[in-house]
Amino acid sequence: LGLVEKHTFEVAGTRFHLVFSGKTEADVERICNDLKPLCKHHLDLFNGLPENDYWFITLLCEDGFGGLEHRASTALMFPRFHLPMRCESDIIPEQYQQFLSLCSHELFHAWNVKRIKPEIMISPDLSSEQYMEQLWIYEGFTSLYDDLSLARTKLISAQSYAEILGQ
């Protein structure tokens, strides 16, 4: 993994760990403070998380984007220079908003996909590909809530959320 930077914060009895793999000059204190209301929103929405710890494990890269949910963690890939730097304004630029949205999306999956799921995902036949018709609802609902959660926690304005919906 190389250089790893870890920060921990607590929300409603759950410890959240923000791990960056790769060098960063980002304002990690700000990122943690921005993630706190987002995590609380999700915990309140689903009446808590059965796990005591949740991990945001982020591979910082030059150019790349994505996430993969797990039961108590997510593996993220995000460009290092799109995170907020120390001494920047409190305004959330679009690129940083995408990081918060990605975190929101993958955390939402801790319930919607990892705990709320169809039978085919509970006991999958791993000897062959498994197709399901419900994937659109899992990704669709999660995609709806990732940015909606940013608006509900006031990390972005209602106007910004309306612009996202318009895209």
Predicted features, each with a name:
Residues 8-134:
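Juxtacatalytic substrate-recognition/specificity segment
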Residues 116-125, 129-167:
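Acidic/His/Gly-enriched intrinsically disordered linker/tail segments
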Residues 1-6:
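Conserved alpha/beta core surface patches that mediate binding of polyanionic ligands
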